[in-house]
């Protein structure tokens, strides 16, 4: 009896098939370093089982195998589609919610911008409709439906950098990333300026310049890329060194409110500051702006409050270590599987000689 792990990725099809999570780096080449380390810890907790974990990027229609012992792990479905196979597997772990979250945080947008965001939600909801109908049919037929558990998206950049004490960091705030990820001549290009990601990041960019003009003493390291793919193709070492060397991470939303940047910041005790954050991280130590226009005043005031800065920094490190660290998430997944009867807590057997 052996726990099996399979990769089913449209990004790296050459790596698809069974893989061994005995090494923490098992999914690095597939672009999933965080989840690979989670599976590394989970595998050690599970021991030998008859479970099969299928790791997929965003395929919600088919899996290479089905059964009550199959666990689907969906890592990149930002469109929050329902799976076609919820009645065919034992459990589903996914990195994004089950309903499109594009409208989160659009309270400050103009009506025309709300319309653009609403279009994206409606589009993605319709894309997920076939799966939702299949699940509804299964429920009507009283078939067993797999539970869904949301897990953090974690980090993408994972190179090792030296820790810099908070008071010794050179930059007050840092941002490196794209403003919009749409390709030229794509069907959605005309809607780019109405989409939540582009809108919020343009507002952030303007707020950065406003902050530097009003408070020239504030040091902000910023650079912009043409797309998300260009961002992840750039030097991870340089990106993480700058993140580590900053007190705040400017954290605008992406295509959805969830971003790698948020977790990469917490991991280093860098304080995320922004306007839109997913509901799943409520309670985490971040600074929420009412709108990006408030950045200048908020940042300058916080930088003067050294005690508050230290508290936020320490809380960020603690939150990562107790809520989002790879081993913590693995233990949470293991507990959920145990509650479902799909895994069993190991008990230590003590011999009479050991007791004596």
Q: Over which residues does each language-model region extend?
A:
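A charged, aromatic-enriched C-terminal amphipathic alpha-helix characteristic of glycosyltransferases
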Residues: 303-345
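Extended, composition-driven regions rather than compact fold-specific motifs
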Residues: 349-350, 354-356
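Nucleotide-sugar donor-binding catalytic core of glycosyltransferases
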Residues: 1-260, 274-279, 283-284, 327, ...
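Short basic/hydrophobic patches in alpha-helices and adjacent helix-turn junctions
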Residues: 248, 264, 301-304, 318
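C-terminal "capping" alpha-helix adjacent to the active site of nucleotide-linked donor transferases
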Residues: 291-308
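Catalytic cores of eukaryotic secretory-pathway lumenal/extracellular enzymes that build
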Residues: 277-278, 283, 287, 292-295, ...
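Conserved donor-binding/catalytic loop of nucleotide-activated donor transferases
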Residues: 244-246, 265-270
